[in-house]
């Protein structure tokens, strides 16, 4: 996703197929971007050099207060030296509906399904003590409620339940987000403050019984979990506090503090990549299958400031510092038998981004 030469990012045909309640409905076929809700499960991944796209068909109707989308697609995999092509082993589809009871308020209900025909899912151990890799078919039911009341009270809630088949196991997994905040509209710098708790299930006993690791599908991985690009919405618990300030009409700043833990000590710490780039939704960053490394990932501070220079130009500056917890100091990375404290240090991220829109 960091290197991709000249290619077709979007290439589709769109046809008006219906007119309902004075609003048209369309069928779009071809290569296209998709973004729904808070981008926890489906996102264009705007942070990466190559935005995420899908090949397939999507029918949608958007009205005054209600939107409905239905789609069947395959994720496009960036190719450095060849034209990008969809992953023919993955079929991803679903239905996403949104109701807006008032301005700035959203209620979503959705069903998503991902099917991978490749033997990439590590399932349960067989009688020969070999972990069986197989295909997977995962369905997700979810709901989201987000918005504000009179530009003061803020809320953001989302819950997701997953079920299906994972290699030679069945899946029962879930995730939720609870967020409450308040916006001080008439105070200097218009500050707003949030408290969030994010949870995504992990497998309590990997390789045995039921598969319990949540699959984050195709998320905006960078935007969540301290924006340090190390953690995904799988086997994780994140209590975080956020503050936003509008220093001037064109300068916005955000500060975050995160307390991060694994949900299951025996399951892995997963990255933010998404199902199109990692077979399990997120690449395994570290794992202690004994559970002795514990669950303390660490704490992270993050700051960003956006300068909106004009209608077309923005400059974004950000910094994050991860204070490594005991888990990072003790759990090995894939291919390592063990890890020493000297190998696991605090992590930092600093970035400057210029964007031009036309």
Task: Identify the role of each PLM range.
Residues 344-358:
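Outer-membrane beta-barrel "beta-signal"
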Residues 30:
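Small/polar (Gly/Ser/Thr/Ala-rich) solvent-exposed segments
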Residues 1-9, 14:
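Membrane helical hairpin/interfacial module
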Residues 195, 241-243, 255, 303-305, ...:
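Hydrophobic, well-ordered secondary-structure elements that form the walls
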Residues 212-233, 264-291:
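Flexible internal linker/loop segments at domain or repeat junctions
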Residues 308-339:
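C-terminal beta-signal and adjacent terminal beta-strands/loops
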Residues 17, 21-27, 41-207, 246, ...:
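Signature for the C-terminal beta-barrel architecture of outer-membrane proteins
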Residues 89-92, 134, 221-246:
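Outer-membrane beta-barrel signature, preferentially recognizing the C-terminal barrel domain
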